Amino acid sequence: MSFSGEMANGKTDVANSGFSSSPEDMSGAEEGKENSSGIEVEASDVSLSLTGDETGTTQAESRDTCSETSGEDKDSDSMDDTGHYSINDENRGNDQSHSEDEEEEEEEEEDEEEEEAVRHRKRAQRKRANRDQDSSDEERALEDWVLSEKTPLPRPRWRALRALRQRQMGSSTRFIYDACGARGFVQRFRLLHGLDGHSGCVNTLHFNQRGTWLASGSDDLKVVVWDWVRRKPVLEFESGHKSNVFQAKFLPNSGDSTLAMCARDGQVRVAELSATHCCKNTKRVAQHKGASHKLALERDSPCTFLSAGEDAVVFTIDLRQDRPASRLVVTKEKEKKVGLYTIYVNPANTYQFAVGGRDQFVRIYDQRKINENVNNGVLKKFCPHHLVTSEAKANITCLVYSHDGSELLASYNDEDIYLFNSSHSDGAEYIKRYKGHRNNATVKGVNFYGPRSEFVVSGSDCGHIFLWEKSSCQIVQFMDGDKGGVVNCLEPHPHLPVLATSGLDYDVKIWLPTAKEPTELNGLKEVIKKNKRERDEDSLHHTDLFDNHMLWFLMHHLRQRGQRRRRRDAGLGAGDADSDDSPSSSDSSDDDEDGPDRVQCIPS
């Protein structure tokens, strides 16, 4: 019995050793499971061998069943009375496996979401990079285009303090002359005031020789002579024209008593002004078969001037003759007439004059050598070489000689402004190029500014006024010049640092260098970029003249036409003093004068 009891106790100890172990002996749930199973088998074998019956097996199975049941009810990590951990190894393994699968799935989903987010970020970064690259490329291309053919600004030649000191000491007799051409003055231009008196777009401006009066002509068919300092009209009168007045100029050395005019109706008229500030009469002295945009004065002659028209004809007009107008030349290119928009007499040689119009060539004629059977009478022609064979049709809207006749400036429609040396041989390339503005919507003017033609000034379709330093081609001034959107006409004062401008607005603007600080050219880069982009788009798509902008012009002018008709019906047209009986126009027809009004920029 004692042996049996010991054996029984031994079985119990062995069994207990199979179901519990100290924490030091536990290395993990799986290891405990394997050890437990092995010990149970050994204890069962020992019990069978010692007792010789099946009692040990039954007891072992009973203990195993009880252990499994109690393991389901107890927490696998709970601690029993002996201080050991009791763990249900199989359930823990299943739970761990299921939990691991869920965690893996969650991790995979998170990884996929993270990868998708990364891909999205990369795509967005690539798009931003592409946009930035495109923008950067555009910026670089614009910078390269603007900076090409430019040179750094030279040091100013005129020093204000030194000039003032010399003037006080009496050693400088040309203070104003030098100051007018100073960059520091140009960079301080600011609007002084406007001159209000027209009811239509102002197309022409011209100072008299002394610079005291300013003449303006408009779509309202009126000409106003201003005392621009006092902001008052000296006189105003009906021009006698039947359509838009394009030019009105004081004839030099006439005592401001003679004003020459031309207009869209093709007429060239002369107004005689009295000392009592009234218009005696206006008379027609020539008639073009198309619109006449410009007149060219001889520097010292009060009686002679030239006119050019869209009919390709250049008239020379001598007011001393019974028949004032005589045809000087018909501009042709390979037997095809070239309509003219602009004409200018060389101030250093009044026999020579230059014309430009509906092709890309600047033509210079000499009145003493015109033989239309030889080179169509042309002395020489200039054109930027890249425009000679260009498919895009380039027109010259305006050209002017420099103060001494050595240079010739030409503004091209939807192109740039080019400077030529007038003494160069036939077909010579340009010497300077001025960029940034846009010349598309109207017959845009261009001019030199300064007593030595130190600067180039032009209007733009963006409504701004651009001033370039001639020598460096750098923009030194940039002003908002027209609320209507287009600046057409720019007239420098003959003696003072004053600039008069006009455009689609119904007023004349006077600019003086009164700003305290030089301009900072704010917004210039964006305006240049916009002008260049619009120009490139138009050149690609070859847009028609009648786009939205031009349709607005057309409607505007049609409204003005109705107003003029009503005014004429009310007896407010040209008075009895107007005379149209000039014999010089006997070979011309007026049949087209009553046709529908056209916008200034649209070819007739």
Curated annotation (Swiss-Prot):
Residues 100-116 have a biased composition (Acidic residues). It is found in: Nucleus; Cytoplasm. The keyword rRNA-binding does not apply. WD repeats lie at residues 197-236, 240-281, 287-327, 335-375, 391-430, 438-478, 482-522. A motif (Nuclear export signal) lies at residues 39-50. Belongs to the WD repeat DCAF8 family. This is DDB1- and CUL4-associated factor 8. It comes from Xenopus tropicalis. The lineage of its organism: Eukaryota, Metazoa, Chordata, Craniata, Vertebrata.
